[in-house]
Structure formats: structure tokens, C-alpha cells
Regions:
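Walker A (P-loop) phosphate-binding loop of P-loop NTPases
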Residues: 13
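Hydrophobic positions on the alpha1 helix immediately C-terminal to the Walker A/P-loop
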Residues: 19
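Pre-Walker A (Motif I) flank of P-loop NTPase domains
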Residues: 2-5
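A glycine- and Lys/Arg-enriched "phosphate-lid" helix/loop adjacent to the NTP-binding pocket
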Residues: 98-165
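NTP-dependent small-molecule kinase module
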Residues: 24, 137-203
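ATP-dependent small-molecule kinase phosphotransfer cores
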Residues: 30-121
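Conserved lysine of the Walker
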Residues: 16
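Hydrophobic anchor at the beta1->P-loop junction of P-loop NTPases
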Residues: 8
Length: 203
């Protein structure tokens, strides 16, 4: 059985979590084995780094290097072994998030990130990436009703706009991989779009 690497991206407050659960149920219903993971995190080491990355102020380049350190461990310990044995992998964020947040939001040189990506996972890339997109005003409003915010979620509106713009630029550059979902739509409408994309992926 083929395994699939499916990633979920979007600005904070775009509403990924509900739809990740929907994809999990879709794969279960279609008898496709999978695991769900997240970035930063996904491994014991990655989860320790996650706490530092989301809550401590640091130089943007240090942040980027730590993201890729966590990612390399994640790939070698979780992602690659599962894909190799036919188990699909769902990841809440992957390298696109580093381009969006560290390059788009914080100005880290894009070539620096690209070089790290080439070193860490030149041969492992998502089969499909769902990008949940909505106006910044909606995402920020949603964030006010959730849990305690991390350092990225607390950033100014201009930061979130730059992250959103970077995500849309990535999606435009790779239209065959990205599925842009307007997450301001109803849950039912969004899930119909997701299901159609997954049907095409596994057919």
C-alpha cells in the first residue's frame, strides 16, 4: 500500500485542528494506516525544543536552526520510518511553516532556509499540503477565544499578515501540492473540499 505524507499549514487561528481530525477519520474509513504528528515537536527531543521555540525570545536565525534540528530528528525518528513501512503521516506544520514564519514573518534569508531544507530533507516532501487561509481579522478574533497564547500568536497584526502573504506565495509556486482552503467558510463546505482532494490523492 502506498503511504502519503500530508501536511497542514496556515496562520495562527486559521482553524487547522478541526480539519486534521476530519482527515484522520477519512483515512480510518478508507482503511489507510496513519500516524498524526506535529511541528515543532513530534519526538521527545522535539517536544522539549517546542517549549523553547514557542515561548522564549531568541534570534530568528537561532530559531530557524532549532526548528530544523527538531525537524531532522522528527524525520529520522517518525516520518521516514513510517512512510517506508506504508504508514501515512499527517503533520500539523512542516517546513512551509519555517518559510512563512521565520522568513516571511521575521526576515530570515530565504536562501538560508532553502539550504537547510536541502540538507535535512531533500528527498522527503509532502504529497499534499492543505493551507488553511482566512483574513487576518478573523484569525486574530479566533485567537482571543482560545487557550493561553504562545509568542507567535501574540505577535502584531503586521507579523501575521506577512506570514499569510508568505504562505500564499509558497502555494502559488507549488500549485500541484498545495490545496488552499478558505477557512472562513462553513465546516461542512471545507470538509467537502478536503474530501475531494483526498479522493484524488488516493485514487
Amino acid at each position: 500500500m502506498n503511504s502519503f505524507f500530508i501536511t497542514f499549514e496556515g496562520i495562527d487561528g486559521a482553524g487547522k485542528s478541526t480539519h486534521i481530525n476530519f482527515v484522520e477519520k477519512y483515512l480510518q474509513d478508507n482503511h489507510i494506516p496513519f500516524i498524526s504528528t506535529r511541528e515543532p515537536g513530534g519526538t521527545p527531543l522535539g517536544e522539549k525544543l517546542r517549549n523553547h521555540l514557542l515561548n522564549e525570545d531568541m534570534d530568528p536565525y537561532t530559531e530557524t536552526l532549532l526548528m530544523f534540528s527538531s525537524r531532522m530528528q522528527h524525520i529520522n525518528e517518525i516520518i521516514k520510518p513510517n512512510l517506508d513501512k506504508g504508514v501515512s503521516v499527517l503533520s500539523d506544520r512542516f517546513t512551509d511553516a519555517t518559510y512563512a514564519y521565520q522568513h516571511g514573518g521575521k526576515g530570515v534569508n530565504e536562501a538560508f532556509i532553502h539550504e537547510l531544507k536541502t540538507l535535512v530533507h531533500s528527498k522527503i516532501n509532502p504529497n499534499i499540503t492543505f493551507l488553511f487561509d482566512c483574513p487576518i481579522e478573523i484569525s486574530l478574533e479566533r485567537l482571543q477565544t482560545t487557550r493561553k497564547l504562545d509568542k507567535f500568536e501574540k505577535e502584531e497584526k503586521s507579523f501575521h499578515q506577512k506570514v499569510r502573504d508568505a504562505y500564499l506565495k509558497l502555494a502559488k509556486a507549488e500549485p500541484d501540492r498545495f490545496v488552499i482552503i478558505d477557512s472562513s467558510q462553513t465546516i461542512e463546505t471545507i470538509q467537502i473540499q478536503i474530501e475531494q482532494s483526498l479522493d484524488k490523492l488516493i485514487s
